[in-house]
Amino acid sequence: MGKPTLPPVVVVVVLLLLVVVLPATTCGADAGGGGEAEEFQIPRDGRVLELDDGNFDAAVRAAGLLFVDFYAPWCGHCKRLAPQLDEAAPVLAGLSTPIVVAKVNADKYKKLGSKYGVDGFPTLMLFDHGTPTEYTGSRKADLLVENLKKLVAPDVSVLESDSAIKSFVEDAGMGFPLFLGFGVDESLIVEYGAKYKNRAWFSVAKDFSEDMMVFYDFDKVPALVSVNPKYREQSIFYGPFDDGAFLEDFIRNSLLPLVVPMNRETVKMLNDDGRKVVLMILQDDESDENSPRLIKVLRSAASANRDLVFGYVGVNQWEEFTETFDVKSSELPTMIVWDKKEEYEIVEGSERLEEGDYGSQISRFLEGYRAGRTIKKKVGDRSPTLLGVNAVYILVFLVAVLVLLMYFSGQGEEDQRPRQRAHED
């Protein structure tokens, strides 16, 4: 006998029941039987939350601002980041506009990571009322707090009183330059507030007293005051405000200190600045007794030559950077003009700054540069006397690369893991 079969009509009825009943059952389970998604409770103690694919969406809805670390347990960079997030989380939770910090094991919850384009660890994202933006700034706790405060702030803050101005400056902290527009219409700077949002604070003061005019040292309005609290610098722009080129030049120039101390963080800040860099290279920019005097003279030159960026660096402080300019200790202190890419120029007759009248020597250097009396060199070039040594270094490097390639070619599971995201603060 053949196996009994169901009539076609019965099959159709069963399928219809499955289509109608199963979705309703599933929704009821997700909603806890009440027909509504369970509300996520944000803890008030400022700890880092551990989220998963079951509560992530609810957490995004509950927290207006949610900063998420998509991590993997085996990732070394993630392990080093964890204590920084633990330190930053209570500070961010205590802001006037709180930011909740959370983490997700994206190696375990791969679909959740894939949904937000996570292809390496750690991946950091800020969810602003549900809208994700990848964060690529510093991962040190204090700088992380400053950067996130800046990201969630309005492009231009409107201040209605002296107390509001003081609170704005205090809340901004020391991490970024500030622009305070006294008697300046918001519409005149809102474009730049958006354009340079990640690099400075912008505000307009609609009501203020004469005390503010005295404190910020301006005597008429409209006036745009630039304050760089980290370097204790201040400058004032009185206009013209109807010419965007002049206004943006002032803003762009004020994003950097008058003389930039070169380090890994400040070099990154130069990327968006189109000016070349007049770089003074010292043996030691901290302990050398002549360094303060040299930097003071360099500051005077910088204020008179705003079409150039001026900076200084000590060999003892950052040898890896200074050696790319092929300078010798016997030639220090020296000056070059660097294009921030592949070339730099030395000025003929100004190869070394001799002790004495530094002001005149720096003036002659700038005159020689503007007159074109320069020799162009490639960044990373070495003198002929170092070719033999470099050849040895290159050989050692190639052997090391070969060994690494052989090692990683034998890895199985490890190669299948998403890459770790290195980040240099």
Curated annotation (Swiss-Prot):
Membrane topology: Single-pass membrane protein
One GO term describing the cellular component: membrane
Localization (cell): Membrane
Keywords per UniProt: Disulfide bond, Membrane, Redox-active center, Signal, Transmembrane, Transmembrane helix
SUPFAM superfamilies: Thioredoxin-like
PROSITE patterns reported for this sequence: THIOREDOXIN_1 (PS00194), THIOREDOXIN_2 (PS51352)
Annotated GO biological process: protein folding; response to endoplasmic reticulum stress
CDD domains found in the cross-reference section: PDI_a_family (cd02961)
Coiled-coil ranges from the UniProt annotation: none
Domain Thioredoxin: residue ranges: 29-153
InterPro entries xrefs: Thioredoxin-like_sf, Thioredoxin_CS, Thioredoxin_domain
Transmembrane segments: 386-406
Annotated positions for site Contributes to redox potential value: 76-77
Signal peptide: 1-28
Cysteines paired by S-S bonds: 75-78
Catalytic site: 75 (nucleophile), 78 (nucleophile)
Site residues by UniProt (Lowers pKa of C-terminal Cys of active site): 139
GO molecular function, one term: protein disulfide isomerase activity
Taxonomy, superkingdom: Eukaryota
Role played: Acts as a protein-folding catalyst that interacts with nascent polypeptides to catalyze the formation, isomerization, and reduction or oxidation of disulfide bonds. May play a role in storage protein biogenesis.
Family, similarity comment: Belongs to the protein disulfide isomerase family.
Identification of the protein by name: Protein disulfide isomerase-like 5-3
Gene name, Swiss-Prot/TrEMBL: PDIL5-3
